[in-house]
């Protein structure tokens, strides 16, 4: 195909005719007005928003979960330390109460002390808690020796022990009055692991030592994270020692970290009761993998509870969430890049190629290649521009041929002037047609340029007019370009709908977070149930108080009956003395009434037998009073274990103990008086036997003696009735005491259950509330990012209701 020459004359396009094409070229070369640049910038902004939002969400979620894990490990360490402290405090309270018992007081023998420690262990509700009980005399031997006066260990009774085998010996000389000292854990000769608690006995000379078993204490350590193990360490300035461990007994007694002192292990040196967390414990130097740890001190002891958890287990959930979120971000980024790269890059490349071809045609290079292998609207646009180029070249060639013919006709002979003139006219007509076509093409190109400029500015609703031109090539170009714009507009609408879907999903996530917060209210109901359990515990304590009041009344009845027995016994003694005097007066006058005297002697012997029976009953009362005293001691011990909730019960138990001691003393008085009556009765019998040899007394004196001893018999019957009343009252006392002990056990169990449930529910409610608040914040942030994406897409003006047919114009 030939290229028009520069001297083509008026048939070649003028410089002013190319102005619209120059404008199109200038617009295409402006980066800020380029569709490719805008599309790339929009994709870049979307990528940045998705990446930044995703990274922020995963960082925030990971930090929240890791903080919850750290708090959980700290709370478990504090809970274990509190459990150990409570265990020590219960033991020390029990030892303090037992050491002040009068049976360890002044003027008590070794046998009395031995009987007391035996009964102390027998009365213990949980016998496995106590390994051995000793009463030691620290004043015998050297500073590191002591003599065991009484013990539940038969082999240890009466032996002298040293601190080498019994570590508590070193502490016996430094204990103050009404104080309790506990040792570090150690192993007894029998292999049991124990902790000794000791206090000065009531006689201020001996020391009561109770060895509590501590072997199963480590079994109660909590482990909420897989692979967690707990150790209780005693740090010193020289070295460290593991006192308890739930990771096996091999570590017990060994250094926490070999060749390290307290100051060389910062976590142990700075541990407090509130608990601390560290990601890099010093213990890692001797472990086979990475661990995190929480430290806290045991209240009142120089012991540190160290809870270790494997790092991969402690932060497993946060690592999974981090991986999931990063994977989601990667998929989203790859999807956006693929969509943008596929649609935007190919479309932009085709538009740039088409723009370059149009610029070449504008410059007069009609041989430029405008072919395309695409079969879509872009390919049709290439074909339309190619057809337009071919039509324009054909018209230019025709104009050139007409001009050449006119020139040849002018050079012909004058004879053919008319034909040449006609040819000139035809040439002028052809020129006029060509100029009209050029003007039409210029106007159409200007309109097309305006539409392209608007589209470059983001207005995808504009369309090229295809119906106001008679040129089929220009109409085909407009139709193809309009169809391409319709596809672009549809793509932008799809992206906007995607942004709307993200915003809608964010709102649904906010609703889900609200539902989770309402679920927290159910946790509050669980706390109310715990409060109900506490009320039930209080009601049971009121019942125990009433039962102990009944027990006190029964003891008072025992005392009243004992007074009645004492009064009747006194009257019996007076009557017996009257009978004795009467018998002495009748000795000289009653020789004739020997048979009557024999009958009197038999009555006195019967009275002696009845007095023996009364003595047995009084012994029974003494035994019951002693048992009541031991029950009161046990009640004191249980009240000490119940902490503050058992204060009222302890007061009642003390009153029961005092009444039992008074009853025992009254029974002793009765027994002594009965002994005196029996002695007097024996003397009366002897005197009556002697009276058989000199019965010179008168009949009247003998009758007085019979009457006196008849009165003695009557009073003896009354004494028996009083003793029976004492027996009945004592039975009531025993029943009330048993019921009080049963209720005390139920109250202790309910108290433990209430404390455990309250602690668990409180921790769960706090953690859930914190997590729901943080998740709600993250969802709100994601919703805001979706709104930002919608704002960026709103820069493109589209019509969602438009049909994507290429015939619509704007």
From Swiss-Prot:
Methylated by CheR. Pfam families: HAMP (PF00672), MCPsignal (PF00015). This is Transducer protein CosT. Residues 775-784 have a biased composition (Polar residues). Belongs to the methyl-accepting chemotaxis (MCP) protein family. Residues 512-748 form the Methyl-accepting transducer domain. Residues 403-427, 751-784 are annotated as: Disordered. The modification Glutamate methyl ester (Glu) is found at residues 556, 739. One of its GO terms (cellular component) is plasma membrane. Keywords: Cell membrane, Chemotaxis, Membrane, Methylation, Repeat, Transducer, Transmembrane, Transmembrane helix.
């Amino acid at each position: 195909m030939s290229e028009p020459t520069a001297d083509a004359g008026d048939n070649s396009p003028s410089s002013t005719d190319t102005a619209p094409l120059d404008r199109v070229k200038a617009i295409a070369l402006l980066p800020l007005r380029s569709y490719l640049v805008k599309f790339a910038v929009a994709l870049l902004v979307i990528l940045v928003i998705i990446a930044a939002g995703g990274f922020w969400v995963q960082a925030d979620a990971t930090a929240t979960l890791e903080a919850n894990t750290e708090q959980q490990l700290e709370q478990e360490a504090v809970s274990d330390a509190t459990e150990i402290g409570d265990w020590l405090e219960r033991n020390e309270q029990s030892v303090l109460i037992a050491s002040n018992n009068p049976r360890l007081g002044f003027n008590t023998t070794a046998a009395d002390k031995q009987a007391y420690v035996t009964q102390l262990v027998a009365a213990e509700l949980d016998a496995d808690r106590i390994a051995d009980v000793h009463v030691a005399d620290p004043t015998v031997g050297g500073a590191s020796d002591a003599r065991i006066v009484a013990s539940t260990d038969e082999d240890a009774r009466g032996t002298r022990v040293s601190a080498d085998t019994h570590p508590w010996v070193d502490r016996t000389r430094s204990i103050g009055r009404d104080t309790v000292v506990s040792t570090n854990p150690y192993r007894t000769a029998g292999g049991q692991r124990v902790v000794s608690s000791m206090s000065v006995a009531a006689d201020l000379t001996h020391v009561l030592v109770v060895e509590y078993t501590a072997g199963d204490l480590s079994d109660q350590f909590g482990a909420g994270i897989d692979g967690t193990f707990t150790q209780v360490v005693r740090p010193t300035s020289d070295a460290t020692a593991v006192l308890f461990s739930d990771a096996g007994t091999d570590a017990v007694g060994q250094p926490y970290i070999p060749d390290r002192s307290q100051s060389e292990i910062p976590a142990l040196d700075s541990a407090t009761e509130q608990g601390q967390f560290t990601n890099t414990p010093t213990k890692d130097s001797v472990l086979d993998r990475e661990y995190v740890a929480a430290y806290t001190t045991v209240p009142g002891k120089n012991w540190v509870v160290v809870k270790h958890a494997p790092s991969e287990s402690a932060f497993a959930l946060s690592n999974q969430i981090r991986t999931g979120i990063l994977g989601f971000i990667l998929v989203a980024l790859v999807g956006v890049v693929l969509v943008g790269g596929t649609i935007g890059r190919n479309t932009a490349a085709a538009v740039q190629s088409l723009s370059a071809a149009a610029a070449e045609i504008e410059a007069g290079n009609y041989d430029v290649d405008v072919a395309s292998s695409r079969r879509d609207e872009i390919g049709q646009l290439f074909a339309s521009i190619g057809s337009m180029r071919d039509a324009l070249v054909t018209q230019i060639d025709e104009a050139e041929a007409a001009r050449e013919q006119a020139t040849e006709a002018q050079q012909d002979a004058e004879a053919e002037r008319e034909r040449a003139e006609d040819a000139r006219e035809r040439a002028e007509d052809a020129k006029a047609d060509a100029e009209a076509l050029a003007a039409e093409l210029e106007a159409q190109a200007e309109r097309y340029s305006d539409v392209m400029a608007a589209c470059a500015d983001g207005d995808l609703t504009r369309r090229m007019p295809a119906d106001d031109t008679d040129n089929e090539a220009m109409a085909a170009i407009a139709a193809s370009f309009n169809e391409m714009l319709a596809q672009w507009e549809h793509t932008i609408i799809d992206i906007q709908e995607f942004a709307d879907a993200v915003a809608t999903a964010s709102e649904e996530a906010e609703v889900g977070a609200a539902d989770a917060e309402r679920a927290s209210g159910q946790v509050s109901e669980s706390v109310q149930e715990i409060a109900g359990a506490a009320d039930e515990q209080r009601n049971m304590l009121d019942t125990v108080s009433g039962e102990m009041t009944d027990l006190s009344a029964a003891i008072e009845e025992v005392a009243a009956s004992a007074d009645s027995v004492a009064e009747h016994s006194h009257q019996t003694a007076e009557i017996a003395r009257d009978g004795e005097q009467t018998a002495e007066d009748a000795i000289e006058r009653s020789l004739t009434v020997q048979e009557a005297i024999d009958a009197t002697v038999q009555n006195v012997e019967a009275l002696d037998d009845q007095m023996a029976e009364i003595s047995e009953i009084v012994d029974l009362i003494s035994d019951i009073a002693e048992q009541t005293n031991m029950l009161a001691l046990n009640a004191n011990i249980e009240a000490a274990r119940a902490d503050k909730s058992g204060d009222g019960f302890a007061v009642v138990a003390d009153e029961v103990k005092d009444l039992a001691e008074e009853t025992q003393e009254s029974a002793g008085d009765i027994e002594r008086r009965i002994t005196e009556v029996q002695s007097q009765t024996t003397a009366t019998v002897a005197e009556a036997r002697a009276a058989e040899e000199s019965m010179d007394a008168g009949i009247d004196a003998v009758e007085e003696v019979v009457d006196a001893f008849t009165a003695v018999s009557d009073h003896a019957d009354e004494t028996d009735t009083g003793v029976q009343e004492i027996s009945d009252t004592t039975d009531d006392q025993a029943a009330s005491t048993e019921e009080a002990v049963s209720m005390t056990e139920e109250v202790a169990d309910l108290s433990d259950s209430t404390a455990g449930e309250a602690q668990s529910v409180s921790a769960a409610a706090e953690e859930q509330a914190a997590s729901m608040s943080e998740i709600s914040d993250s969802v709100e942030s994601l919703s805001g990012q979706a709104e930002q994406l919608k704002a960026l897409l709103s820069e493109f003006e589209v019509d969602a209701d438009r049909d994507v047919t290429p015939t619509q114009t704007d």
